[in-house]
Amino acid sequence: MCGIVGAIAQRDVAEILVNGLHRLEYRGYDSAGIAIVDQEKRLQRVRCLGKVQVLAEAVAAEKITGGTGIAHTRWATHGAPSEDNAHPHVSGQFAVVHNGIIENYEQLRIDLQQKGYQFLSQTDTEVIAHLVHWVMRNETSLLRAVQQVVKQLKGAYGMVVMDCEQPNHLVAARSGSPLVIGLGIGENFLASDQLALLNVTRRFIFLEEGDVAEITRRTVDIYDVNGHPVQRDSQDSHLTHDATEKGTFRHFMQKEIFEQPRAILNTLEGRLHQHNVLVDSIGNGAERLLEQVEHIQIVACGTSYNAGMVARYWFEHLAGISCDVEIASEFRYRKFVTRPKSLLITLSQSGETADTLAALRLAKEKGYMGAMTICNVAGSSLVRESDLAFMTRAGVEIGVASTKAFTTQLATLLMLVIAIGKVTGNISLSQEEELVKALQSLPAEIEKALAFNQQIESLAQDFADKHHALFLGRGEYYPIAMEGALKLKEISYIHAEAYAAGELKHGPLALIDADMPVIVVAPTNDLLEKVKSNIEEVRSRGGQLYVFADKEAGFTETEGMKIMTMPKVNEVIAPIFYTIPMQLLAYHVALIKGTDVDQPRNLAKAVTVE
C-alpha cells in the first residue's frame, strides 16, 4: 500500500502523475516513485525516500516526459522504507505498481529465483513484475499475461502493469484493494482513489473484486474473475476540485474539526421531516428489513469501532434492540453464532477497510438477515456489496486522524436507531419527536463546543512534557474516552489509554501519580455520582485531573483538578458534543509536540491490507 496513479494520453503525463500523488499524500507513505515510457519506448524511472515533493523535483531535474506512465506512494509492509523498495518495480520491459499484500510471495520468490530471476528489493511486489516477465516469454498479450499471473497470487492486490514495448495500453487488476478508472476525452487514467484524478476527470468506473482491465487512450475493456467481458457503470463524482485544499487552516485535521457543524447538517438533510426520521431515506426496502430486526451486529475498526460502541447504548436503551460490537479483525477469524433476525452493520469512512470488507463477506455466508454499511465514500466496496448503504455526508476527510467522519457516523447511527425503534414499535411518536429535535440542534451545539478552542489550546500546554495519559468515562462516555485516547496517541505520540471509570480499581490506579494526566468525560447523567467517586480515587493518589462537564454536574476546580465547564446539552446527543473537546485537545497537544498532525508516523488513512 498506499497510493496508485496511472495515465495514458497524447500529452505528457508526468505532471498528472505527480499531482495525483500529491492528492494521495493524506493516506500516508514513506517513499514515492514514477515510471514513464518516452517516445523512443525507453522506460524512465525515478524513486525516492520521503515526500512526493522530493520526487517532483527529481522528475523535473531529469526532464522525464512521455504519454504513458504509472506512479506510487509506498507505505512499507514488506521491506523497510528505502529507494530500492519503492515502486514502480521493474522486470525487463515491464513496470508494476501494487497496493496490498501477496501472502504467498516467499514461495513465488523461491520459484522465480530458481528460474534465474534476481531480486533487487525485499518487497512482495517485485514478484509480480518477474511473474509478468516470465509469462510474457510465451505470450503476446499483456492482458492475458496479467490474467494468468493473478491466478498465482494469494492475498490482496490492486496493481497496474506497464509494458514499455507496447506503451499504448495499461493493464490493471483488483482483488481486495481498490482501483478506479478515470475517463477522459482521448485519454484515460487509473488510481487507487478518485481524489487523485479530480483535476483531470469527474467520470469514474470502480473496478469490482476480481476485475482485470485494459485501458488505452480511447478504450476501456474490463473482464471479471472468470475472464468474461463485463460492463461496469460509470459514475460522475460530486467531489469538488478543491476538496484536498486546506484553505486558511493550518492543517487538514483542524479544517475538518471546524467543518463538523456543516458535515452533520449535510448528513441530516433530506432524512428528517419536521420531527420525524424518513425511513425510506435509508434505502429501498429499508422499512421492510428494519421492522424484522431483533439483533444488531456492528463490525468496524479503529475510530469507527468507537462509534459503534456509542451506538450500542443507543440501540439497546432507546430502540430496545440488543446490539453487539466487534473489531473486524477479530470477528472475521473466530467461529461465531449468528443470531436469528440479526442485521449486520459495518462502519467505515473509506468503505475499503480490508478487515471490515472481509467480515462483511464472511457474514453474508453465515445467514445474517441483511447487511447495511454506514460509509462516507459512494461507490466503495462496502457500499457496493451491502444490501443497504446509509451514507454519511462528511465530505472528503484528509487527516489520518478521523474527526468529521466519526461525528457524522454517530449522527447517522442515531437516525438509524430512531428509525428501527419507530418501525419496531419501541419508540413512540412523542419520543421520536424529542430525539429528532435533539438531532436537529446538534450542528448548533457543536458550534458551541468549537467556541472552547482557545481555552483548550491553553489547557494543552499542561501536556507539553507528558508521555502518558489516561481517559475515563462511564456508559456511553466510555467510548468517547476511547476516542479521545485514540486521537491523542495517533497525532501527539503520547501513550494514552481509556478505561471504563469503574475499572480503575482493577489495575489502572497503579499508574496514577503527579505525572499522569487523567482526562474525565463527566456530564450530568444517572452515572455522575459514580464518576465522582472515581475522580476522588484519582485525587487521593495525587493524579492531575482534567474534567469535562456541564455546570449542573457541580464540580469545583481545586489544586490537582482543572474543570472545563461545557454547556448543558440534550443527553442523547451529548456523546457527540463531548467528542469535540477531545479532538481539540489532541490537536493542540500535537501542535505543542511538533508532530506531523495530518500524516502521523506509521499510520495510513485507508487500511486496505490486513
Curated annotation (Swiss-Prot):
<comment type="subunit">
    <text>Homodimer.</text>
</comment>
<keyword id="KW-0677">Repeat</keyword>
<dbReference type="InterPro" id="IPR029055">
    <property type="entry name" value="Ntn_hydrolases_N"/>
</dbReference>
<dbReference type="Pfam" id="PF01380">
    <property type="entry name" value="SIS"/>
</dbReference>
<feature type="active site" description="For Fru-6P isomerization activity">
    <location>
        <position position="605"/>
    </location>
</feature>
<feature type="domain" description="SIS 2">
    <location>
        <begin position="459"/>
        <end position="600"/>
    </location>
</feature>
<dbReference type="GO" id="GO:0006487">
    <property type="term" value="P:protein N-linked glycosylation"/>
</dbReference>
<dbReference type="GO" id="GO:0006047">
    <property type="term" value="P:UDP-N-acetylglucosamine metabolic process"/>
</dbReference>
<dbReference type="Pfam" id="PF13522">
    <property type="entry name" value="GATase_6"/>
</dbReference>
<dbReference type="InterPro" id="IPR035466">
    <property type="entry name" value="GlmS/AgaS_SIS"/>
</dbReference>
<feature type="domain" description="SIS 1">
    <location>
        <begin position="285"/>
        <end position="426"/>
    </location>
</feature>
<keyword id="KW-0032">Aminotransferase</keyword>
<feature type="domain" description="Glutamine amidotransferase type-2">
    <location>
        <begin position="2"/>
        <end position="218"/>
    </location>
</feature>
<comment type="function">
    <text>Catalyzes the first step in hexosamine metabolism, converting fructose-6P into glucosamine-6P using glutamine as a nitrogen source.</text>
</comment>
<dbReference type="GO" id="GO:0005829">
    <property type="term" value="C:cytosol"/>
</dbReference>
<protein>
    <recommendedName>
        <fullName>Glutamine--fructose-6-phosphate aminotransferase [isomerizing]</fullName>
        <ecNumber>2.6.1.16</ecNumber>
    </recommendedName>
</protein>
<dbReference type="GO" id="GO:0097367">
    <property type="term" value="F:carbohydrate derivative binding"/>
</dbReference>
<dbReference type="InterPro" id="IPR035490">
    <property type="entry name" value="GlmS/FrlB_SIS"/>
</dbReference>
<keyword id="KW-0963">Cytoplasm</keyword>
<dbReference type="InterPro" id="IPR017932">
    <property type="entry name" value="GATase_2_dom"/>
</dbReference>
<keyword id="KW-0808">Transferase</keyword>
<dbReference type="GO" id="GO:0004360">
    <property type="term" value="F:glutamine-fructose-6-phosphate transaminase (isomerizing) activity"/>
</dbReference>
<dbReference type="GO" id="GO:0006002">
    <property type="term" value="P:fructose 6-phosphate metabolic process"/>
</dbReference>
<keyword id="KW-0315">Glutamine amidotransferase</keyword>
<feature type="active site" description="Nucleophile; for GATase activity">
    <location>
        <position position="2"/>
    </location>
</feature>
<dbReference type="InterPro" id="IPR046348">
    <property type="entry name" value="SIS_dom_sf"/>
</dbReference>
<dbReference type="InterPro" id="IPR047084">
    <property type="entry name" value="GFAT_N"/>
</dbReference>
<dbReference type="GO" id="GO:0005975">
    <property type="term" value="P:carbohydrate metabolic process"/>
</dbReference>
<dbReference type="InterPro" id="IPR001347">
    <property type="entry name" value="SIS_dom"/>
</dbReference>
<dbReference type="InterPro" id="IPR005855">
    <property type="entry name" value="GFAT"/>
</dbReference>
